């Protein structure tokens, strides 16, 4: 999956960059794309002499806010359709350049070594689970997807005291990796960056799609 994501990103970045026609390409991208984009950045520059690429990572909702406030951005890559739809409604992007370039999977994770491993989503109600990392639903797509999953399971209200809000999906990942929480909601691609340190408890059937577009800047 990681190789496919990188290949898709490289191809999409090249296509969008051609449309943007910038010597210094500033890309605002969802936090879950951090590792993939940092890896392909040098490859892109090698294939496009004279073009320097700079990345700005964060929660998709925050990236749209930054763009609305005048941030100098050439390409916008979000982790959900809603954020890109918002950017389009605010005429912040060139709609004819919009493409869906990748997908992902929302997962529930925990530390690989734990005394009482979780087996399923409902186990989050157990007393042993005191803190659960989740992206802020208002600005973090992964958090919004997680809320939908919890609401569908009838767990959202009951788990409120345990939820630890994260500014982006990578912060939620870090909370789990550092042992500051017992579980967290992230994307499968994020969990994969931690090797065998973390364990995927459950995958969820949520349509996670990544759109990209050239901005109007």
Where are these regions (language model features)?
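Bacterial N-terminal signal peptides
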Residues: 7-17
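Positively charged n-region of N-terminal signal peptides that target proteins for export
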Residues: 1-6
């Amino acid at each position: 999956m990681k190789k496919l994501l990188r290949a898709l990103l490289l191809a999409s970045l090249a296509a969008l960059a051609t449309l943007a026609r910038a010597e210094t390409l500033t890309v605002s991208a969802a936090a879950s794309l951090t590792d993939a984009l940092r890896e392909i950045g040098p490859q892109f520059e090698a294939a496009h002499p004279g073009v320097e690429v700079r990345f700005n990572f964060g929660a998709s909702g925050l990236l749209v806010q930054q763009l609305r406030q005048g941030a100098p951005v050439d390409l916008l890559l979000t982790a959900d359709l809603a954020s890109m739809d918002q950017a389009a409604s605010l005429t912040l992007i060139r709609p004819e350049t919009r493409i869906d370039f990748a997908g992902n999977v929302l997962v529930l994770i925990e530390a690989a070594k734990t005394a009482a491993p979780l087996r399923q989503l409902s186990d989050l109600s157990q007393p042993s689970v005191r803190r659960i990392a989740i992206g802020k639903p208002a600005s973090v797509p992964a958090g919004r997807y997680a809320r939908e999953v919890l609401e569908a399971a009838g767990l959202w209200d009951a788990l409120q005291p345990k939820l630890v809000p994260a500014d982006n999906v990578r912060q939620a990942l870090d909370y789990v990796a550092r042992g500051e929480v017992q579980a967290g909601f992230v994307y499968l691609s994020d969990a994969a960056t931690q090797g065998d340190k973390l364990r995927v408890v459950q995958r969820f059937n949520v349509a996670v799609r990544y759109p990209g577009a050239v901005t109007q800047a």
